[in-house]
């Protein structure tokens, strides 16, 4: 049966009326049951079940307990038992999660496109397919590609990373033979991760709020949307009662800034200069932890005039200036490294890495930072002095019989410092400030998630050319893109030869990813989707699905099995599952069973099973070859290997938790990996960046890569943050655009495309949740004669878009703020879902050249009445 756009909307309209008329779970669920059976469901005896599981709507993975009455999910509450290990509550998005499952607009059958033209106004002319026909069609296409060149397949996922587990996607693409699996981290926190990796060879940080007395928060808005929000919000409140002071530095008065002791409205993109000025205040006053810098970091290592660290005869071991012997030596037993100064060795002059930092911030005074960042010099000085004072440099504390470094002041960020053209350098500046007071892995400081877990991050990048991957990760174009690059595949497929890709991609599979609307300059992304055969696995007819050739319906997190990801805290960790509790539309498959079936039809089932064991790092209980697995059986296998617990524990409790002892929390990270002689060192000075720059320069010149701007790249690849990193491309070039355009996340739709139709979030919570607005400072609005509720136009060098003005005090006068997640246009959404401004459409595209992270907060704009 052929389904036109009108027929598609009519098909969901019968059930859509239920959603439009009220918010009863009963009404929607019974309508869904009626749709499944073809008639109204008969009354049954009342059966009430309590089901413990995990939320998968955002990357907090909160523990939940659902009440299921006669197969209908009636309520979702936080699992009280999980409070000791992570979340004490859940957000409205999680509490209303059943409305995503009972959404009448959901995809229910496989669909095939019959209109070859693709575009927002093109009717795909969908035709329903059986699962057999869908599998046969997709498998035939995949087999042809696998036989010819497996690299021609691209797999992309977004929130799908958490719905079935990225490990399954890794295993399947590895078995298939394509290097092109790409996830969404460059739309989230990649720059922060890479800054961590360059500095301490791992990623994942949290402030030790249980003991902290001062939190300097540069744009981590965990009262609205953040990865660890459901622990950070609760722990912050507990610690405030015990004396914690919070200072939030960001251009917009966010939820977390509104509840802080102080809000510092820094000019967008200029916080790196503010941080460097604070570092200068600490250095000039001598309020730094010199023993920490010497013993744990590479601050004493000798650096030549070209920025390269002096090495021993082996070409690998860094040298320091030994104050005992008066010569350049490796930091071994008996050597006492100099922290500061310039020294002569082998007829050349070298400075310590710390001295390079000192010289680099010499002119970045608080007064200079005031001019750039528009934060008073007195405020910058006071914050630096307070940070040093509260860090209590040199103090120790005894906990559980262990004498530990005590540094109860911490600087933290999420997207605030990282979602920019120089995002890696932004957070590197924050890490340096933390290192100066010695709070890394200290009580009350910044707790690292596995210091030196990946020593390869300290190496010079591979700088691949020609690139192996379509996203260009770890190639000469993005040498330290360790977390894939979400946005580049759809650019690359438009002109593979331009970047030297030695093959032409033909097919893309998208799983739970609405990539094109999620990143800057969205319409360029959609152009890429016209170049490939696209298969989309999702729960809704997203904009990406609108450009698909085959659409396969997926199950929601309340309908499917998963060995679920979880969030740890500085004190706890836990393992969990997610289990099904309803299936109102009687759907046959989730993404795992789709992958399993395709692997069978491609003759690679056993390879898939073998790769699953590798991807999940299973050691004792393995996925066996020569047999099939249901989603539940796979989860049982992983649970048994990871927890050594009977599966009945998973079914009854949903998780098993563990609490970290004092030694594992404070003494197994930097103390074990970096402290003292004969150890690797944290990189205050990221020398691998300058070494990588010289390698890129060589490759670019040998291959005549004119698209690589070496001057721009040298700024990006500085071993230390500099003032240049406060001036991204739009700030330097868009002189005729007076306003800074910044973006932010809101809880209601953050990182979860399938909540776009949630009737509770769209209608029941009020107008503030129903759409987004263009936030304008009251003074600016007066000057422009703009009032709240009026339609305004935002104009950038990319294009124009309209939105509804909201006049506020809580944003800088030179700044316009618009949230993501709104303004979507797919005909597969309810009318209530298609409201607001899709700000990504007009954001400039200037990704971080180190990590590939998208620059969501660098665009300049004009603003006027529509």
Functional labels for PLM-detected ranges:
Residues 353-355, 366-484:
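Active-site phosphate/pyrophosphate-binding segments
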Residues 113-133, 287-381, 578-704, 741, ...:
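N-terminal leader/propeptide and maturation segments of large enzyme subunits in energy/redox metabolism
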Residues 1-291, 295-338, 376, 509, ...:
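N-terminal export/assembly segments and adjacent metallocofactor-ligating motifs
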Residues 580-581, 590-643, 648, 752, ...:
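Long, contiguous, secondary-structure-rich segments that constitute the structural scaffold
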Residues 167-247, 273, 334-341, 353, ...:
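Extended redox/cofactor-interaction regions of prokaryotic respiratory oxidoreductases
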Residues 255, 543-577:
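Flexible glycine/proline-rich, aromatic-decorated loop/lid segments
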Residues 260-266, 559, 573-584:
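Short beta-alpha connecting loops at secondary-structure transitions
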Residues 135-153, 205-214, 360, 383-410, ...:
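Glycine-rich phosphate/diphosphate-binding loops that line cofactor/substrate pockets in enzymes
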